[in-house]
Every structure is written in C-alpha cells, then in structure tokens.
Amino acid sequence: MTNFTFDGAHSSLEFQIKHLMVSKVKGSFDQFDVAVEGDINDFSTLKATATIIPSSINTKNEARDNHLKSGDFFGTDEFDKITFETKSVTENKVVGDLTIKGITNEETFDVEFNGVSKNPMDGSQVTGVIVTGTINRENYGINFNQALETGGVMLGKDVKFEASAEFSISE
C-alpha cells in the first residue's frame, strides 16, 4: 500500500469555456484536495476522491466570479463542494462519479501518469498526474445562457479542464 500526501502548493485545477462564440474564458478553482489510496504499482487498486470548493473560483474578474458563485451557476451558498469519486483507474483513463450542484453523473477522463521522482529539496519521493476532460455543464443544472443577436449563445455548454496533482509518496 502506498501512502499519498496531496501537495496543493504544486497542483492546479484550470478550466475554459467558449464565450460569445468567438473566444474562451479561462479560470481556476484555487481550493481543492485529492485523497488517494492504493498501490502506485497497480493502477487497478487506486481509489481517489477529489473535493473542489466552488466558491474558490477565480477568473481574474471579481464581478464574473461572484456571478459564477450565484444560483445561475454553482450556487455556492447551497452547494459548497464539487466531488469526483473514482470507480476505476488505468494508466491513461479514470472513470468516476462527478457531483456538481447535487447532480451526479459518471464521467470518463484522460490521465497522464508522470512516474515517480525524488525531490532534491527534501529527498522525498513524489508522483504526479494530469487529468484532462470535457464536461457538459448543462448535465449538472448549470444552464445559464443568453442568445446572441448574431446567432449562437453567450456561453458554450462544454467546459474543458486540466487538473495537475502532485503527491508525496511513501510505502
């Protein structure tokens, strides 16, 4: 069994969504945690739970961030966390239950396992993964949108994300 200690200082969770049919808005969730258990040498044994604090959303625009925290989007007063619980893990895919605003759907995401390295600062063993994927926000009750007079809509329904997580590990 491998002991995993999440290193939030060296991890990130970023997203992007199409805006006005012509560009993308990017942002991040600045507060999240990932708990992992299992054997790093046997992916089939790995179980992980990610917990994201949606009120930590950061698009570098306070007014937009406040709107994203409102009931039009994440409803952070009522729904204070987003969770992802794995069902299966392979070297390049993860399947699990994603819960946003109390709505749970099974999702499959791509995984890039980056091996194990020794941290020269403290001698600890570290590992990291990058998880990428796309979710349909409307599947989670995030339906806010506005029609554009030129056709199309203000916001795309697909949200792309990249999560990079680093862990100290020990046996």
From Swiss-Prot:
Pfam families membership: YceI
Domain of life: Bacteria
Signal peptide: none
SMART domains: YceI
Similarity comment text for this entry: Belongs to the UPF0312 family.
Annotated protein name in UniProt: UPF0312 protein SA2479
Origin species: Staphylococcus aureus (strain N315)
